[in-house]
């Protein structure tokens, strides 16, 4: 497959979410593991440039996580995620995060499910609101679904979670019903 351009950009769902929050003026912290590599150095500089708290970032002996995104001529993307050190994030890491009532705890699935679930459990116990972007999509434990206040999904993710195909011909009412069924399964 021949391509016609390449860009190297800092990101990942978690970092993109943190940058968006920080740009909106929210006090933002990021939990993650950064490798001792060129990507890690660039990521750390980018994170600091956006005034994101780095207290919960740890160095990893594994490489920094990366994603390779391809976009076809129709604008459809395909993403390969290699989590690197972020795959080592665990419940103990999330226990260290300071969360207060009224905070918004945001996560995605580029870290282990057990860590996301522990983070949301702590957030709910502290009175925070939880927001989950379940990508890359996979089966979610019922506990995580029940701990999630706000679920941000695209068409593919919604189809997967409600276990039924959704197409351009699916009515808004059917989509709403499918979304409601996620919590009640």
Residues covered by each model-derived region:
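Glycine-rich phosphate/adenosyl-contacting loop at the front of the ribokinase-like
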Residues: 1-33, 38-52
């Amino acid at each position: 497959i021949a391509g016609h351009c390449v860009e190297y950009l800092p990101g990942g769902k978690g970092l993109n979410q943190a940058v968006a929050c920080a740009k909106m003026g929210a006090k933002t912290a990021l939990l993650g593991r950064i490798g001792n590599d060129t990507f890690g150095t660039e990521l750390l500089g980018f994170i600091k440039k956006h005034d994101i708290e780095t207290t919960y970032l740890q160095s990893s002996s594994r490489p920094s996580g990366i994603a390779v995104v391809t976009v076809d001529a129709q604008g459809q993307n395909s993403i390969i995620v290699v989590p690197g050190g972020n795959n080592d994030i665990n419940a103990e890491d999330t226990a260290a995060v300071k969360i207060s009532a009224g905070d918004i705890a945001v996560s995605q699935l580029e870290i282990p499910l057990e860590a996301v679930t522990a983070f949301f459990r702590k957030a709910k116990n502290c009175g925070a609101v939880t927001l989950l972007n379940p990508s890359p999509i996979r089966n979610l434990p019922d506990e995580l679904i029940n701990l999630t206040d706000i679920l941000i999904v695209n068409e593919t993710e919604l189809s997967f979670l409600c276990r039924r195909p959704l197409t351009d011909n699916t009515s808004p009412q059917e989509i709403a019903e499918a979304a409601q069924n996620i919590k009640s399964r």
